[in-house]
Amino acid sequence: MFDTVIEMLSYPFMTRAFLVGSLVALCSALLGVSLVLKRYSMIGDGLSHVGFGAMAIAAAMNAAPLTIAIPVVIVAAILLLLISGNAKIKGDAAIALISTTSLAVGVMVISLTTGMNTDVYNYMFGSILAMSAEDVKLSLVLSVFVLILFIVFYHKIFAITFDETFARATGVKAGVYNTLIAVLTAVTIVLGMRMMGALLISSLIIFPALTSMRVCRTFKSVIINAAVISVVCLIAGVTLSYVAATPAGASVVLANLVMMVLYTVVGAVKNHMR
């Protein structure tokens, strides 16, 4: 086992996968708790489809994928908030509207230009080989930026997560912080797409939060446990991907599923013993 770990870390692409993956998993878990509690967890799925469309366009233009995808997905996240604020269009409908349109654009661009090549396949399903050195540098900077902003505005995010109406009454600018959460989520989604894939990246937002809630009862404990679960499952999934030659995204999701089953059993036992 130890020899396998040494062998994995001897490859630069594995070191990049563990480093960036852990940071993205950490950011996803922190944001995921608020998104799940606000019943807005599927925003990750919607934005990942937007990211796929943006990366397809970047591939057709031979441009750097992250530099194209990040601003496009941020705009889409803000647009989602504006549309969902319209009483005539609910949040889930807004997500479906934007995500399906973006996916259609991506598929059309691919069919008219490059076709289903390896890069596009990696964007959809993820690959531990997909992270370049430039991607790592940008991902490190942006991940640290996301973490710092979340920590700095933790109390405001806590307030709008549990009672947005009361938060507004106490002077908290809920719209600003909702936008902040959406923008941070957009950046995190794009950073994780290269490894997890557009079809599976939303699992990093949903699984750790729901798993932690099986056992934990306070906001802080849920966040801490979700962060630990997310990073542990990411490392386990990437390791499985290397050993078994399976897609990284699928391996991480399965690791999260196993962890959720374990936490559900532990939670049921704790409730039974009370």
What are these regions (language model features)?
Residues 155-156, 265-274:
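Membrane-interface capping segments at transmembrane-helix boundaries
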Residues 33-116, 212-224, 241-244, 267-269:
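Short loop segments and helix-boundary regions at transmembrane helix junctions
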Residues 2-16, 87, 95-155:
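Transmembrane helix-bundle core of multi-pass membrane transporters
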Residues 22, 26-30, 71-79, 105, ...:
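Generic alpha-helical transmembrane segments of integral inner-membrane proteins
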Residues 201-250:
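Transmembrane alpha-helical segments in multi-pass inner-membrane proteins
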Residues 136-208:
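Helix-loop-helix "hairpin" substructures at the membrane interface of multi-pass membrane proteins
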Residues 17-20, 66-73, 92-96, 140, ...:
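Loop-to-transmembrane alpha-helix initiation sites
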Residues 4-9, 124, 128-129, 229-266:
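C-terminal binding/interaction regions
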